[in-house]
Structures are given as C-alpha cells and as structure tokens.
C-alpha cells in the first residue's frame, strides 16, 4: 500500500498499472482515493484476468472505487499480439455494468486524452538541472 501511495505522489508518475493482481494485495480504497487527490490515473487492463488468475474481483473493486472517488482510468488491451490491440470486451462490459462515467476514462476519445496529457504537462515540475 505504501509503495502505491508513494508512487501516486511522485509528480512524474501519471498512472498506476497492473494494480488488480491478487498476488500483491493493498488497501485499494486508500490508493484510489489518493490517486484521485493527486490527479493520477488507474489502468484497467484487459489481460489481467487472463494472465493473473483471480484478478477480476480485485479489478471490479478498484473500478467501483474509481467511480466512487472520481478517479480517472485508462482502459487498455495490454496486447501481446497484434490482433489484440484495442480489444477490451471484458473491460468494456465491466464499465457498462458499473455505469462508469465516460468522462473519467482518459482514453475514451482523443480529445479527452489530449486534455489529460496537457493537464499533466502543466502540473509536472520542470527540470532545472
């Protein structure tokens, strides 16, 4: 938990990925709440349930918490083969079932992604070294 909390507080970190693995339990609510406070994104990874058995329940809890705390997410296929790029039917179904707000999905469309990237660029401290 502390490692995730420390990570979301680092100005150069934009997103927490692969957070639904049951092999690495953490205080999901504390991390999602802090990610929202710090303007960070939580990845929703389509491959989690395939590559990390047991992660679907954790991912569902994390997505629900993201909705509750208005934490932005990024949905991705985590494709390991070219035909899987952009393919995330399980994640889409989960988001629909939870009525997850589209405005919290930073890559729902190109405008939202551009807006997020511009916002993050303004927030990051400039290197002066």
Located regions from the model:
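Acidic/histidine-rich, metal-coordinating catalytic segments
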Residues: 18
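Charged catalytic cores and adjacent phosphate/nucleic-acid-binding surfaces used
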Residues: 5, 10-13, 23-129
């Amino acid at each position: 938990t502390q490692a995730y909390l420390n990570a979301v507080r680092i100005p150069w970190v934009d997103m927490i990925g692969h957070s639904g693995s049951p092999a690495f339990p953490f205080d999901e609510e504390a991390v999602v709440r802090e990610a929202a406070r710090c303007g960070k994104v939580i990845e929703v990874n389509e491959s989690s349930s395939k590559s990390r058995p047991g992660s679907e329940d954790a991912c569902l809890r994390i997505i629900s918490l993201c909705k509750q705390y208005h934490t932005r997410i990024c949905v991705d296929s985590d494709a390991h083969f070219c035909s899987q790029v952009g393919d995330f039917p399980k994640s889409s179904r989960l988001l629909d079932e939870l009525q997850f707000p589209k405005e919290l999905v930073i890559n729902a469309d190109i405008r939202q992604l551009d807006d997020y990237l511009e916002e993050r660029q303004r927030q990051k401290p400039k290197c002066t070294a």
